[in-house]
Amino acid sequence: MAVSSENVKLLREMTGAGMLDCKKALEEANGDIDKAKEILRIKGLAKADKKASRETKEGLIVAKSTPSKGAMVELACETDFVARNGSFKELANKILDYVLENVGDTKGESRDSSILQGKIDGITIEELLKEAIAKIGENIQLKRYCVVEGPNFSYIHGGGRIGVLLSYEGDNLDVVKDVALQIAAMRPEFLSPETVPQDVIEREKAIYMEQAKKEGKPENMLEKIAEGKLKKFYEEKTLLHQKFIKDEKKTIQDYTKANNVTIKGFCRFEIGT
């Protein structure tokens, strides 16, 4: 049957599909816009599966805090152009709202793919991503997310390229903000030496001892040299042992303790890492 140009235009606005695809879908659906949308969606999902293996090095980080809970999400895509797209940002924030409302404390970043079966307005997140891939034309993936419970603070830098979410105890919000900025700038990987996994410690020590051995250091000094380098590792990689960027005479632990603030945990996301 013949379809009107108005309906083709309307379907294009609703789905983001090409004019010819919209015309064919309407003809196949005998002019029924809802059926045509479903036809396009099915075809779009097939296209989306083909794009799913393409690299996603760009994206957007979004975060939201309430007094009792905070969440952060990284939605990945292929190009910076798409990362700035309004519908991409809208999708990121939809997923963020779902995570904030439905996911408990993740105890750090999570990449658990079971979240993709969660439903937003009756449609799974997996289906929403595939629809976005079909509409926008790039691979789009939910890369990771983080949830903290209790008092929290979130900070987004560089238009969504870096995100920080931390949980804390205390009343000095200025100190908490300073710590969030520290995390964004200095890239700590762990909260404290006590939270560094044992396998990471053993790996670092082995590297340091091997380096010292190759430099011709005495065998009986290797352990001591490795311990010294491990101390430097803690100063670089653990938040509480880092030097405070606003006053390098203090560590973050010194600064927070002096102001009755306790940092309980944090997540740091950066696009491309």
Swiss-Prot record:
Role this protein plays: Associates with the EF-Tu.GDP complex and induces the exchange of GDP to GTP. It remains bound to the aminoacyl-tRNA.EF-Tu.GTP complex up to the GTP hydrolysis stage on the ribosome.
Species the sequence originates in: Hydrogenobaculum sp. (strain Y04AAS1)
Keywords: Cytoplasm, Elongation factor, Protein biosynthesis
Localization of this protein: Cytoplasm
Name of the protein this chain belongs to: Elongation factor Ts
Stretches the record annotates as Involved in Mg(2+) ion dislocation from EF-Tu: 79-82
Protein biosynthesis found in the keyword field: yes
GO MF term (any one): translation elongation factor activity
Annotated GO CC locations: cytoplasm
Record family assignment: Belongs to the EF-Ts family.
One Pfam family named in its UniProt record: EF_TS
InterPro entries: EF-Ts_dimer_sf, Transl_elong_EFTs/EF1B, Transl_elong_EFTs/EF1B_dimer, Transl_elong_Ts_CS, UBA-like_sf
Family matches, as NCBIfam families: tsf
Name of the encoding gene: tsf
